[in-house]
Regions:
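Glycan-recognition and catalytic regions of carbohydrate-active enzymes
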Residues: 193-217
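Aromatic- and carboxylate-enriched substrate-binding clefts and catalytic-loop regions
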Residues: 2-171, 175
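Short, well-ordered loop/turn and helix-capping segments at boundaries between secondary-structure elements
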Residues: 87, 113-116, 185-187, 191, ...
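Catalytic domains of carbohydrate-active enzymes that cleave complex glycans
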Residues: 169, 178-197
Length: 217
């Protein structure tokens, strides 16, 4: 993956430390599909080849990131990516993306869209940010045009006054119940559990409840 538009990356090959066929095989044994995270610009450069190759390998979807604009060229890029992925039965989770404008209806393989000031902001935010208030406000605004991938589920929690942004050990403002409530309130067909596996192991009751919540009602 690359966020730098000028950096050339061959997305048809993984780094040597990642044995992708073995990961896909293990996922099938556990009945779990594999999703690849890709920058949209590097994906666009090898779009047809990447979709064909990874579809044949058994990849189920792409989490496409770093568009970060909504001009005409960017919109055309999104449509091209969505159309090509649909041809190869690959679903999309669009991050770094503008809010839905109907493209999710045109391309049903788009299962979720960020387009929101999501929980990742906890990595670099400050206690000047009132995240709990924001979290109960944007459903009445941002969710009007379509679903939202907020990536909730933070298990390390604190009050607003004690909150400190931390990239490597992020915490969230509010309570764990506040985080759990997002899975119920937010329209998010392909939702995330954004914290680390060890955090959920420590909060088994919360993790089990989150896993029991339907993606759609």
């Amino acid at each position: 993956n690359s966020k730098d538009d000028n950096e050339k990356v061959d997305i048809l090959h993984t780094i040597k430390e990642i044995n992708l066929p073995e990961i896909i095989k293990y996922g099938k044994e556990k009945k779990v599909g594999v999703v690849l995270w890709l920058g949209i610009n590097v994906l666009s450069e090898q779009l047809e080849e990447a979709c064909k190759q990874y579809s044949q390998m058994g990849i189920k979807g792409f989490k496409v990131d770093f568009l970060d604009r909504n001009d005409q060229t960017a919109v055309e890029q999104v449509y091209k990516v969505a159309e090509t992925c649909a041809k190869y039965n690959i679903f999309l989770d669009l991050h770094g993306m503008y809010a839905p404008t109907g493209y999710n209806r045109t391309f049903p393989n788009i299962l979720n869209v960020e387009g929101v000031w999501g929980l990742e902001q906890a990595k670099w935010g400050s206690n000047k940010d009132d995240m709990p208030t924001y979290c109960v406000t944007f459903p009445f605004l941002r969710m009007m045009p379509g679903y939202v991938d907020y990536t909730p589920g933070g298990m390390r929690n604190c009050t607003k006054d004690h909150f400190v942004g931390d990239y490597y050990w992020p915490q969230t403002q509010g309570t764990r119940c506040h985080q759990i409530g997002m899975y119920i309130v937010y329209d998010s067909p392909l939702t995330m559990m954004a914290d680390s596996p060890t955090a959920y192991e420590k909060e088994e009751e919360c993790a089990s409840f989150i896993a029991s919540i339907p993606n759609q009602y």
